[in-house]
């Protein structure tokens, strides 16, 4: 059904502990995008952090969006945690730009 509909789906919090399940869905459905809010700050140092990095590497960075989850996570802390995560897992400059702002810009302009 995800391939039949044109409606964009923005999956929040990267699916949390189900990030690998979400990745499998998103790989098959070009209308599914994944937001990183909350999950990176919450799961720092866990196996889920590694699963998120694996999922981004597996899918590519084009449908992953930065999200702060403000006010539940302080905006500055969220940006800091996300940038540390991206650096720690060896993401390239263009992948970081995609995740941090380009994909969000493209998503909201494409589906306005």
Model-derived regions, located:
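Conserved, mostly hydrophobic/aromatic
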Residues: 13, 34, 69, 96, ...
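Catalytic pocket-lining loop regions of alpha/beta-barrel enzymes
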Residues: 1-65
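Membrane-targeting and insertion segments and their boundary/processing signals
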Residues: 53-56, 70, 78
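Residue-level detector of alpha-helical recognition elements and their boundaries
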Residues: 37, 49, 67-70, 101, ...
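Mid-to-C-terminal alpha-helical segments outside catalytic/metal-binding sites
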Residues: 60-63, 76-112
């Amino acid at each position: 059904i995800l391939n039949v509909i044109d409606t964009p789906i923005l999956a929040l919090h990267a699916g949390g502990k189900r990030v690998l399940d979400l990745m499998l869905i998103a790989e098959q459905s070009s209308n599914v995008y994944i937001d990183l809010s909350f999950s990176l700050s919450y799961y720092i140092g866990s196996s889920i952090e590694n699963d998120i990095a694996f999922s981004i590497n597996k899918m590519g960075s084009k449908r992953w969006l930065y999200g702060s989850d403000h006010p539940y996570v302080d905006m500055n802390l969220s940006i800091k945690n996300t940038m540390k995560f991206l650096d720690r897992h060896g993401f390239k400059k263009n992948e970081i730009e995609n995740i941090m702002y380009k994909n969000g810009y493209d998503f909201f302009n494409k589906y306005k």
